[in-house]
Amino acid sequence: MASGDELKRRLTILGSTGSIGTSTLDVIERLGGRDRFEVAALTGNGNIPLLAAQARRMGAELAVTADGDRYGELKDALSGSGIEVAAGRTGLSEAAERDAGWVMAAIVGNAGLGPTLAAARRGADIALANKECLVSAGSLFIDAVAEGGGRLLPVDSEHNAIFQVLENDQRHAVERIVLTASGGPFRTKSLDEMQHVTAEAARAHPNWSMGLKISIDSASMFNKALEMIEARHLFNLRPDQIEVIVHPQSVVHSMVGYADGSVLAQLGCPDMRTAIGYALSYPRRCDLPVERLDFARLARLDFEAPDEVRFPALRLARRAMEEGGLQGAVLNGAKETALGAFIEGRVGFLDMAEIVEEVMNDLAGLPAATSMDDVFAADEQARQAAAGMIP
């Protein structure tokens, strides 16, 4: 089991060139860089110049590109550095298996499932930013973490908030958790207005700086829907214990309600480096140069119930949790296909949820996964079914 408490932490970052990966490296450098952290492996996809620069800067032992065709390019970029180079699935597996007590799982999508599962099974502490591990693989992934004996440290700001305020010796007294949602750029728009919004308009998140896909997921609240499913597995909750509240300021990141009526919340300025820093230094707290919350300047905190007519993704997540089986994988696979069609202008914003619901109807009753092959098969079925509904 990884202790996670050593003075110099040895780590691997799966997905170092993405948003979470680059933020993780930023936090590492702010906390002392190579004096305090030893980088076993970094993995990326197509941004070879950035991956090579990161590997050189951090003195990584191994650099991996998930794109097998780019092996030569990465090899040339790291020529003379002494850094090992690998590529493709084999390379990702090698990075996951490399001896490191702490692993940031930040590869986006199903590509992150295999290496993250492998790292969990060998007992690494997993800082989890990949949604599919819990949404699609659910109990399979939780079982792998238990089998390995490492710790699971959520990096999503909402789940990280719950993790921080959840008293381990009082879990039996948890009545509910409350995930906060900003409401996104369309919080006050009517149904008719939402049907005609564009992908570029969905990108304008009021509080967080994110990529196009995650911004659209946030605008449709599909991101929050996935977080509901993740929370169920992370904290071993019933579906009826998970609530969502719209909080436009994104200052209260989430809350835990206890049986005695107490509600504990974690607050902070919206900055992913806070959650990353907490996961990176756990169980200690580190000194991070992030913006401090000024309550006098903040003045007010607003909360409102989500409108599940305009944002049906929340209802679909609840259904997926209640039905169980592989419905999480089905929801996610269908959503990914519908999202791609929306970005391409082939379907409207509200059509995405309708497509997902139809696919969930068609594929209802798939049994719980017993292997990753089951998860991938359900995902592929959902994507194909969704594609068949798109003009």
Curated annotation (Swiss-Prot):
Protein residues bound to NADPH: T17, G18, S19, I20, N47, N130, E132, G211
Keywords from the named record: Isoprene biosynthesis, Manganese, Metal-binding, NADP, Oxidoreductase
One biological process term in Gene Ontology: isopentenyl diphosphate biosynthetic process, methylerythritol 4-phosphate pathway involved in terpenoid biosynthetic process
Residues the record lists as binding 1-deoxy-D-xylulose 5-phosphate: K131, S157, E158, S182, H205, S218, N223, K224, E227
Binding site for Mn(2+): D156, E158, E227
Annotated pathway: Isoprenoid biosynthesis; isopentenyl diphosphate biosynthesis via DXP pathway; isopentenyl diphosphate from 1-deoxy-D-xylulose 5-phosphate: step 1/6
GO function terms (MF aspect): 1-deoxy-D-xylulose-5-phosphate reductoisomerase activity; manganese ion binding; NADPH binding
Keyword Metal-binding: yes
InterPro entries, alphabetized: DXP_reductoisomerase, DXP_reductoisomerase_C, DXP_reductoisomerase_N, DXPR_C, DXPR_C_sf, NAD(P)-bd_dom_sf
NCBIfam families, per database record: Dxr
Listed HAMAP family: DXP_reductoisom
PANTHER family assigned: 1-DEOXY-D-XYLULOSE 5-PHOSPHATE REDUCTOISOMERASE, 1-DEOXY-D-XYLULOSE 5-PHOSPHATE REDUCTOISOMERASE, CHLOROPLASTIC
Identification of the protein by name: 1-deoxy-D-xylulose 5-phosphate reductoisomerase
Organism: Sinorhizobium medicae (strain WSM419) (Ensifer medicae)
Organism classification: Bacteria, Pseudomonadati, Pseudomonadota, Alphaproteobacteria, Hyphomicrobiales
